[in-house]
Amino acid sequence: VNAPTQTLLGRPLVGDGADGASGPVGQPGGDGGILWGNGGNGGDSTSPGVAGGAGGSAGLIGNGGRGGNGAPGGAGGNGGLGGLLLGNGGAGGVGGTGDNGVGDLGAGGGGGDGGLGGRAGLIGHGGAGGNGGDGGHGGSGKAGGSGGSGGFGQFGGAGGLLYGNGGAAGSGGNGGDAGTGVSSDGFAGLGGSGGRGGDAGLIGVRRRRATAATQGSVRACSR
């Protein structure tokens, strides 16, 4: 049954989509069957700065796949869409943690933003937004480096048009600590903003906005 539709439309009639492979560049999850099937999860990325793979979307009935996690400093992948008739949206992936700074004035890397939560169709709950990654710590040396900023938490997906709760908002990543120096210290990284909760359908609960994360700390100068 799946062979003709796979050939013509590049998508099976029924069945779950395959999970995306993890690696230097995380691959997107496959879409679920046109009539029934869940979307595959996105793959996690490992190469610095690369976003995670997006979650696959469902067809008529099924849940969206989860977005893959970002590599260091990379954004999380977006969650897949829930089924047009019935199904929940996929959760967004988590942003990667920023790299730590090295040596004099070595600034920490910024954390990656979370992935968007997938929305539902007619009936179903929205996917949760991904959390932002923490910022990297500043390097230590003659002059300390600044900590990296935390990534932004992402929006939760909208609930189904008829019934469904909005997806929970992603939390922002914590700012990185400042590096210590003999002559001067670096600045602490800012915490990332929290995402907004997803809208509800005709019947359902809208989620609140997530709170912002904490700023990094500044340690005592070593001079």
Regions found by a protein language model. Name each.
Residues V1-G10, V14-G17, A21:
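Amphipathic alpha-helical hairpins/coiled-coils and adjacent low-complexity
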Residues G17-R223:
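Collagen triple-helix signature
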